[in-house]
Amino acid sequence: RLCRQYRAKLGDAHPGDIRTLDDVRKLPFTTTEDLRAGYPLPLLSVPDTEVLRVHASSGTTGKRKVLAYTRNDIDTFAFQMARCYELAGLTPADRMQVAVGYGLWTAGAGFQLGCEKFGALTIPVGPGNLDIHLQLLQDFGTT
């Protein structure tokens, strides 16, 4: 039952069939329609009781596209975002002010998870309210 969509798309393909870059190009992509078809929890490869969080698109072009996150997904997401900060030259001594949106979309949560995993002071302000941003920037020395 789990991830029937992938099983159907991949057909008889097996990991051993992928030997070259050209073989990878033959694999089907996950499309917007794939995500919408399984709404509200599309493309699960675990029981839905293992889903800890969902994020979704705004739904402006149709049904929302939902991404379901397990504990492992959240941990991996935090690690990837922390790695981005490291590669950008930041250090845990930096103070990061998260100015992107929080809510259904994944941006705010992802930036915050990454900051915390990275070990930097995190100030989750969100978008807008320039006065608060400026005050916190001055008060905390946001880098």
Model-derived regions: residue spans:
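Alpha-helix capping and helix-loop boundary segments enriched in small/acidic/polar residues
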Residues: 72, 102, 124-128
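Loop/helix-junction capping segments adjacent to catalytic residues or to phosphate/diphosphate-binding pockets
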Residues: 75, 105-106, 131
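Nucleotide 5′-phosphate-binding alpha/beta core
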Residues: 1-56, 61-79, 83-87, 91-93
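Conserved AMP-binding loop of ANL adenylate-forming enzymes
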Residues: 86-122
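Conserved adenylate-forming
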Residues: 5-8, 109-143
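General N-terminal targeting signals
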Residues: 41, 52, 83-86, 107, ...
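Short acidic, glycine/Ser/Thr-rich loop/turn "cap" segments at secondary-structure junctions
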Residues: 62-69, 93-100, 134-137, 142
